[in-house]
Amino acid sequence: MTTKVRFTVAYDGTGFCGWQKQKPEDQISVAQVIEEALSKVFNEKITLFASGRTDAGVHALNQVCHFSTHRKIDPNKKWDLCWALNSHLPPSIVAKKAWIAPDDFHATLSATHKTYRYLIVNKPRPSAHLNRYADWVRLPIDIEHLQESSKYLLGNQDFKSFQSVGTPVPDTVREIYKADWEWRKPGVMQFTITGSGFLKQMVRNIVGTSLFLERKGLDPSKMQEIIAAQDRMKAGPPAPAQGLYLMKVYYPQDLDNRCLEL
């Protein structure tokens, strides 16, 4: 008999090859580091499942994972699993909260939608403190143009134009519920997008295309044409990885209610 554990983790994606293990073996992934730490805590081999895979250099504030262990965990006896796990993790990875999850919970398959955020420093000079955590654009950006083009992202559409080449999936249709640009503070803007799911590098490709249209002075409605084309070559280049954050993963309320906090 096994116990299923759900937990959230934040990480600085700098220096990692992404969430998933990669070849050659000398590349270090976020999942690999967490699995090794969990194996030390539970004294058994742990296999980790996450809500999704982030690329090299991409960060997360609330990545959701689950694993199963042969250790029996009593939810009535408070055990700070996150404290135990963090003692085996580097400072760039932090376990935030943990629960005993029901058998039908799955970090990947149970997720209903996700929110990502992209940060851009828009100043004449780059930021020494944000260079690993945001893109830098020197020339002034017309945020109204970006916001206007983002309206064409909303709804249930085929986003094949924003799928990176070489990553085939059976279905490229996704539903976008929210897509907004705003100033986070003077000189720093953010793009927040919530959807039912995202294709590989989809958010970075959307941001890169939005900036491309704005810089070239093309009408924001061009975004609609690019989506309709279902052709990656019609879209702009991807924005750099370091500006992207996985902010939140959503699950059915029923599943959330049946998770017992540790």
Curated annotation (Swiss-Prot):
Homodimer. GO terms for biological process: tRNA pseudouridine synthesis. Its EC number is 5.4.99.12. It comes from the Bacteria. CDD domains: PseudoU_synth_EcTruA. It catalyses: uridine(38/39/40) in tRNA = pseudouridine(38/39/40) in tRNA. The gene is truA. This is tRNA pseudouridine synthase A.
